Amino acid sequence: MVKRIGVLTSGGDAPGMNAAIRGVVRSTLFKNKEVFGIYDGYQGLYDNQIQQLNRYSVSDIINRGGTILGSARFPEFTQKENRARAIKNLNSHGIDALVVIGGDGSYAGAELLAKEGGIHCVGLPGTIDNDVAGTDYSIGFFTALQTVVEAIDRLRDTSSSHQRISIVEVMGRHCGDLTLAAAIAGGCEFIVIPEVPFDRKELITEIKAGIAKGKKHAIITITERICDINELSQYIEKETKRETRPTVLGHIQRGGAPVAYDRILASRMGAYAVELLVQTDHKAILSCCVGVQNGKMRHAPISECISIDNKRQKFKEDWLDVANTLF
């Protein structure tokens, strides 16, 4: 039976991570188990930055953005000798289970710890990109969405005043969920996402068609890394003869107090992770990730959640249909 549970946050931070940490800590203590915080992700696990936590360690953090445990990217964790040192550190503290809050890379690290060290590991999806399979939504997605929509609303004010085209670059890496949701909620006229092939000439045709119908201004949302939006802005202005301005929202999307849904989702996921760990049999090493599907908590093997095929199946085509209908 699991006696000591560790918790860490890894990769890019997301609003709601603190709520998840709180959920893990309070639920572990409720089950009369001990809980340890691991600072600065896998880097901290490697450096043995591990400290026992109590219920007061997580007081007044549910409303705070970021992560009190800190986070770091630690590519050296791909090396087996570094993972061996991390496992040794866990064993030295008597930690036999670990909750990892993060994205795909964090999940992959957790799976290796389970395989190589016999550590029970549960992953919680903590990323604003919403690009983790096995869950409808990840912790932080809805807070980031609110941030992006508020920015779009402000840009629309100035775009309409100057009859201008605005291009808004949104985070997401290779996933267009945040861009797509923001475009729908912000009433944007055009959307460019990784899941749909991008044709600049086709975009110009659509913009000109809107102008011909009397459209005075427009907002274009685009997922990061698709193209250089400064160059795209110049191209659109040249082809349409309309003033065009790019805006990169950047890391502001990761910050801020989490919205209510993210706080609830993170709390539920944290509690569910502990429930899975407490119920697990030591003979069968647990390596799974938690998600919400159709409103209910679910779990699946980490290997399934980080597979390319499952990530492709996650794309919200119904959202794209709505967007195309409304635009």
Swiss-Prot record:
Enzyme class, spelled out: transferase
Gene Ontology molecular functions: 6-phosphofructokinase activity; AMP binding; ATP binding; fructose-6-phosphate binding; identical protein binding; metal ion binding; monosaccharide binding
Binding site for substrate: T127, I128, D129, R164, M171, G172, R173, E224, R245, H251, I252, Q253, R254
UniProt binding sites for Mg(2+): D104
UniProt-listed Pfam families: PFK
Catalytic-site annotation from UniProt: D129
Biological pathway: Carbohydrate degradation; glycolysis; D-glyceraldehyde 3-phosphate and glycerone phosphate from D-glucose: step 3/4
PROSITE patterns found in the cross-reference section: PHOSPHOFRUCTOKINASE
GO-annotated cellular components: 6-phosphofructokinase complex
Binding-site residues for ADP, renumbered to this chain: 22-26, 55-60, 156, 187-189, 213, 215-217
Cofactor(s) required, per the database record: Mg(2+)
Top-level taxon of the source organism: Bacteria
Reactions that this protein is recorded to catalyse: beta-D-fructose 6-phosphate + ATP = beta-D-fructose 1,6-bisphosphate + ADP + H(+)
Activation/inhibition comment: Allosterically activated by ADP and other diphosphonucleosides, and allosterically inhibited by phosphoenolpyruvate.
Primary site of residence: cytoplasm
Key word ATP-binding present: yes
Family matches, as InterPro entries: ATP_PFK, ATP_PFK_prok-type, PFKA_ATP_prok, Phosphofructokinase_CS, Phosphofructokinase_dom, PKF_sf
Biological process annotations from GO: canonical glycolysis; fructose 1,6-bisphosphate metabolic process; fructose 6-phosphate metabolic process
Family to which the UniProt record says this protein belongs: Belongs to the phosphofructokinase type A (PFKA) family. ATP-dependent PFK group I subfamily. Prokaryotic clade 'B1' sub-subfamily.
Function of the molecule: Catalyzes the phosphorylation of D-fructose 6-phosphate to fructose 1,6-bisphosphate by ATP, the first committing step of glycolysis.
Oligomer status and interactors: Homotetramer.
Protein name (record): ATP-dependent 6-phosphofructokinase
Source species of the chain: Hamiltonella defensa subsp. Acyrthosiphon pisum (strain 5AT)
